[in-house]
C-alpha cells in the first residue's frame, strides 16, 4: 500500500513547441537524474534533450515517440520516503497524436503545457478531449512568461472556454516579457523572484502580500498590480480543493518559464503533493484495483531499437495491480501461454536499468521477441482484457513497396516491428494484395522511411493511393457481412489483427455503403 501511495504516473502533453520537452528536462534536473538540461530551441538542439533519444528526434528537434522516465523526488522541507515519479513525455507533433492517445491510457494524471503568447492551440484541444473522455485530472503550466505574451486573465478565460474545464490559479505572474519579475506562489504563499538562465536556484521569499516587504522586492507599481490581481483571482475563482482536481472538475494553473527553470520546482512540489496515486483500471471483465494482491498489467507501447547497438524491441507495460517480480511466471492472456522476464527494465529515456520488482503505476520495459502487440494483458492466471487502446481511422494513405529486392527480409522485419509499435497502421488490400500504410500526418511516412533505412538497412518506395476513409466493419448476421464483402471486394482490406476494414475512396462511396447496407456497422476506431 505504501509503495502505491508514493507513486505519481503522469504524461506531459502540449501543442508542438509549447515547451513540453524542456519542462520534462527540468523535472529530471530537480529529480537529480541529469546535471544539465538540453534545451530545444528553434528546432535546433543546443544540447541533446534527454527525452528525445531517437536519431530523427535529435536531428529535427521534435519528439516523435513517447519517452518514459522515472526518478525519486522529495520536496524541500518534507521528510520520509520520496515520491516515485514516472513521467511519460509525449510527442507534441500533431502527426503523432495516436501515440499520445495511447499513452494517456497508461497515466493517472497529466500536465498540459500552454504557450503564454499562443494560448490554446488545436492539439491542446484534442488532447484535453482525450483526458476528459478518461476523466484524467490535469494541471496546466502556462509557459514562456519571460517572453511578451497575452494577459494572464485572457489566457485563463480562453482555457475555460476552449478546454471546457474550470481553472484555479495556484501561482500568479508579476509582469511578463522584459518586465517579468517572478511569480507569487498562491498555494505556498511565497514570492519567487526571477533570475534568467539559472539552472537550479531561484530566490524564494516568505512574504505577506500586504506587507511593505513586497514593494521592496518587486517595486511599488508591480506590488500594487499583484495585490489587485490576487484580489480578483480570489474573488472570481473558487477556493482550491484537491478532490475537485482529482475528479477532473478543476484544473490548477501555474505560470513560469521552463527554459529559464522558473516556476518549475513550485509546479513539481505541488504536483507530487496533490496528484493522484495509481487509480483502478477498467478491464472488460471487471474493475481492477491497484491494491489487489495479484499482478496485472497491459502493454501500451512497443519500441524497436531503443538501443542502436543491440537490435532489440522493448514492450512498455503499465502495472495495474499487485507486484511485478523478475523471473516470475505470468500468463500472456492473448497467447494463452506462460512467460517469464529475466531482465525487466526501468528507464531514463535511452538509459535503462534492470529491476527486480515493480508496483502499480510503474512502467516496466519487457524484452520483446515478437510476442507482444499493443493492448496485450499479463496476469497471474486470470483471463482479463484491459480496455482503451484504440487505433483511429487514418487521414493519409500510401502504398508501400520494397525498393531493394535483395533486402526483402530486412524490409519485412522492419515493417512488422514498426507496425507493432503503432507508428502507423498497415492494411493489406484483399483485391490486389498490396500493403497500404495509413497515418494521421505526412511526417509519419518520413519517419517510417528513415527508420527502415537507418535501423533495418532496408529501402521503401511510396506510391499514391486515393482513399478517403478506413472503417472497421461488423454485423450481427455473418451472412450479411459476407455479402457486403463480396459486393465491395475491391474496397476490402485486413488490418494487422485480421479484422475486416472497408477502404472508401470517397465520402460518397462511404455514405452510399452505409445507406445500402443498414445491417453493417461502420466504426472509425478499432475499439468497438
Regions found by a protein language model. Name each.
Residues 1-528:
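Structural and coupling elements of P-loop NTPases
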Amino acid at each position: 500500500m505504501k509503495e502505491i501511495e508514493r507513486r505519481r504516473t503522469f504524461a506531459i502533453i502540449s501543442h508542438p513547441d509549447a515547451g513540453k520537452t524542456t519542462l520534462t528536462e527540468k523535472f529530471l534536473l530537480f529529480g537529480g537524474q541529469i546535471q544539465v538540461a538540453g534545451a530545444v530551441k528553434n528546432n535546433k538542439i543546443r544540447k541533446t534533450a534527454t527525452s528525445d533519444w531517437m536519431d530523427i528526434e535529435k536531428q529535427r528537434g521534435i519528439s516523435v515517440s513517447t519517452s518514459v522516465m522515472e526518478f525519486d523526488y522529495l520536496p524541500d522541507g518534507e521528510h520520509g520516503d520520496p515520491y516515485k515519479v514516472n513521467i511519460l513525455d509525449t510527442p507534441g507533433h500533431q502527426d503523432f497524436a495516436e501515440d499520445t492517445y495511447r499513452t494517456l491510457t497508461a497515466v493517472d494524471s497529466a500536465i498540459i503545457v500552454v504557450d503564454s503568447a499562443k494560448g490554446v492551440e488545436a492539439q491542446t484541444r484534442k488532447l484535453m478531449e482525450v483526458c476528459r473522455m478518461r476523466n484524467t485530472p490535469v494541471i496546466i503550466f502556462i509557459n514562456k512568461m519571460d517572453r511578451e505574451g497575452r494577459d494572464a486573465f485572457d489566457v485563463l478565460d480562453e482555457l475555460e472556454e476552449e478546454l471546457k474545464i474550470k481553472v484555479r490559479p495556484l501561482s500568479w505572474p508579476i509582469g511578463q516579457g522584459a518586465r517579468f519579475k517572478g511569480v507569487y506562489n498562491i498555494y505556498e504563499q511565497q514570492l519567487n523572484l526571477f533570475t534568467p538562465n539559472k539552472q537550479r536556484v531561484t530566490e524564494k521569499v516568505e512574504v505577506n502580500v500586504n506587507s511593505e516587504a513586497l514593494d521592496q522586492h518587486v517595486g511599488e507599481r508591480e506590488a500594487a498590480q499583484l495585490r489587485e490581481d490576487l484580489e480578483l483571482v480570489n474573488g472570481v475563482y473558487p477556493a482550491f480543493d484537491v478532490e475537485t482536481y482529482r475528479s477532473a472538475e478543476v484544473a490548477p494553473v501555474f505560470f513560469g518559464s521552463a527554459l529559464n527553470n522558473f516556476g518549475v520546482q513550485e509546479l513539481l512540489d505541488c504536483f507530487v503533493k496533490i496528484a493522484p496515486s495509481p487509480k483502478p483500471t477498467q478491464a472488460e471483465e471487471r474493475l481492477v484495483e491497484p491494491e489487489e494482491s495479484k499482478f496485472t498489467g497491459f502493454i501500451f507501447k512497443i519500441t524497436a531499437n531503443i538501443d542502436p547497438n543491440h537490435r532489440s524491441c522493448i514492450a512498455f507495460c503499465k502495472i495495474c495491480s499487485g507486484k511485478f517480480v523478475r523471473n516470475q511466471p505470468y500468463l500472456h492472456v492473448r497467447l494463452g501461454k506462460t512467460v517469464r522476464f529475466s531482465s525487466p527494465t526501468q528507464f531514463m529515456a535511452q538509459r535503462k536499468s534492470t529491476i527486480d520488482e515493480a508496483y502499480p503505476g510503474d512502467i516496466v520495459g519487457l524484452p520483446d521477441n515478437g510476442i507482444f502487440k499493443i493492448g496485450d494483458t499479463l496476469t497471474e492466471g486470470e483471463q482479463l482484457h484491459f480496455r482503451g487502446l484504440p487505433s483511429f481511422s487514418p487521414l493519409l494513405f500510401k502504398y508501400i513497396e520494397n525498393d531493394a529486392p535483395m533486402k526483402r527480409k530486412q524490409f519485412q522485419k522492419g515493417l512488422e516491428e514498426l507496425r507493432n509499435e503503432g507508428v502507423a497502421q498497415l492494411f493489406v488490400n484483399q483485391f490486389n494484395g498490396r500493403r497500404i500504410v495509413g497515418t494521421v500526418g505526412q511526417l509519419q511516412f518520413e519517419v517510417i522511411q528513415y527508420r527502415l533505412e537507418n535501423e533495418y538497412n532496408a529501402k521503401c518506395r511510396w506510391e499514391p493511393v486515393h482513399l478517403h476513409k478506413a472503417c472497421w466493419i461488423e454485423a450481427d448476421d455473418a451472412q450479411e457481412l459476407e455479402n457486403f464483402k463480396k459486393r465491395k471486394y475491391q474496397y476490402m482490406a485486413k488490418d494487422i489483427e485480421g479484422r475486416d476494414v472497408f477502404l472508401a475512396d470517397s465520402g460518397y462511396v462511404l455514405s452510399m455503403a452505409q445507406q445500402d447496407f443498414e445491417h453493417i456497422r461502420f466504426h472509425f476506431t478499432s475499439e468497438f
